[in-house]
């Protein structure tokens, strides 16, 4: 595999994957296809060698452009997505366009040229789970984590659009022989994440002298994974995964939002209660938890960032050291949240 396309490669998770490939696979040339919406940033690719990484500014819904690029590549890794739940509740239309129509455009081109395709998705397609304390197996029993066999039950316009794209990929594999795999990952954290998201929002609030905000009671649980571990898992699936299979990516990082925020405040030298509780998101999923045993057992993948505290400290340090990357957008992001009382 000498040439790959990474859609959304100037965004958070996509750009981290590009860095991972450049740092670990010197034989691979990466073409980044990114629309550079508010969540895409050329600066995320700064410092990468020009002979290894090419940025094409364009829309994955542009069938002519996609066709031109796909016919010259060995594989497409599809990260590009509208992904912020709060935005999907205000205006679902970009989520339908990018996440469904864009994915369709890509798989059609990959089908036409018989190009390997990997579809990056989310655990949110499965809906949510009860809290561990309310389950007979305390979160470890049968059906108490998401598996590749879990029934889809999306609860937001965002997760519904991702579920739709997953199902298109499955249908194209079965109907047309598309050379595809799917991964559904838990919540990512790490460098280059847009400051509208939970962890970077709170870090940059503290750095800006703004009190952090917690939705509702903060008991909602997310299964956190460092984005570097997500990148290594996607590479393992791309190169070793079985065509037509779905792999779940997780690092056993379950934490509720309140605990994450209090740990973040502690690591930043602030009182653990120095935050404001604000109104909850409508339809806020209660708990996500990933069973990644298939990925680990079949492909031999293991996460490296198994200590959430050290991973969070690493992330805090990155935002502290890179204020120029996020500072210009901070006021607008907080003003947007303030309109919703959040």
What is each residue range found by the language model?
Residues 1-188, 318-322, 328-342:
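N-terminal Rossmann-like NAD(P)+-binding domain of SDR-like oxidoreductases, especially those catalyzing
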Residues 4, 17, 30, 58, ...:
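C-terminal substrate-binding subdomain of Rossmann-fold SDR/epimerase-dehydratase oxidoreductases
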Residues 12, 156, 190, 197, ...:
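Amphipathic alpha-helical recognition patches that constitute DNA-binding helices
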Residues 42, 67, 89, 195-196, ...:
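Conserved strand-to-helix beginnings and helix N-cap segments that scaffold or border functional pockets
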Residues 48, 132, 195-203:
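A glycine/serine/threonine-rich, flexible loop-to-helix segment
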Residues 78, 193, 202, 219-220:
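Glutamine-centric residue-chemistry signal
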Residues 150, 154-161, 191, 195-199, ...:
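The catalytic Tyr-centered alpha-helix of NAD(P)H-dependent dehydrogenases
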Residues 164, 168, 172, 202, ...:
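Hydrophobic alpha-helix immediately C-terminal to the catalytic Tyr-X-X-X-Lys motif of short-chain
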């Amino acid at each position: 595999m000498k040439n790959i396309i990474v859609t959304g490669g100037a965004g958070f998770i996509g750009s981290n994957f590009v860095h991972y490939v450049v740092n670990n696979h010197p034989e691979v040339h990466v073409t980044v296809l990114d629309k550079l919406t508010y969540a895409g940033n050329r600066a995320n690719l700064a410092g990468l060698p020009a002979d290894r990484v090419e940025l094409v500014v364009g829309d994955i819904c542009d069938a002519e452009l996609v066709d031109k690029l796909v016919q010259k590549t060995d594989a497409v890794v599809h990260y590009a997505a509208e992904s912020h739940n709060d935005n999907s509740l205000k205006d679902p239309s970009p989520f339908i366009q990018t996440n469904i129509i864009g994915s369709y455009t890509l798989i059609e081109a990959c089908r036409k040229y018989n190009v390997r395709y990997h579809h990056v998705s989310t655990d949110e397609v499965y809906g949510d789970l009860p809290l561990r304390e309310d389950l007979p197996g305390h979160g470890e029993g049968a059906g108490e984590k998401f598996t590749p066999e879990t029934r889809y039950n999306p609860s937001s316009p965002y997760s519904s659009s991702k579920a739709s794209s997953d199902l298109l990929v499955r249908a194209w594999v079965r109907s047309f022989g598309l050379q595809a795999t799917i991964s559904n990952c838990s919540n990512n954290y790490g460098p280059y994440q847009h400051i509208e998201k939970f962890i970077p929002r709170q870090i940059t609030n503290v750095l800006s002298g703004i009190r952090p905000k917690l939705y509702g009671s903060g008991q909602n649980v997310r299964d956190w994974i460092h984005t570097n571990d997500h990148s290594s898992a996607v590479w393992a699936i791309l190169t070793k995964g079985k065509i037509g299979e779905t792999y779940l990516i997780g690092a056993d990082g379950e934490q509720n939002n309140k605990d994450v925020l209090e740990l973040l405040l502690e690591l930043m030298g602030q009182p653990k209660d120095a935050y404001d509780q604000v109104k909850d998101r409508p339809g806020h999923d209660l708990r996500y938890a990933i069973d990644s045993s298939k990925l680990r057992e079949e492909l031999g993948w293991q996460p490296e960032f198994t200590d959430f505290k050290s991973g969070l400290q690493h992330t805090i340090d990155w935002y502290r050291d890179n204020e120029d990357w996020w500072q210009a957008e901070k006021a607008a992001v907080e003003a947007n949240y303030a309109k919703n009382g959040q």
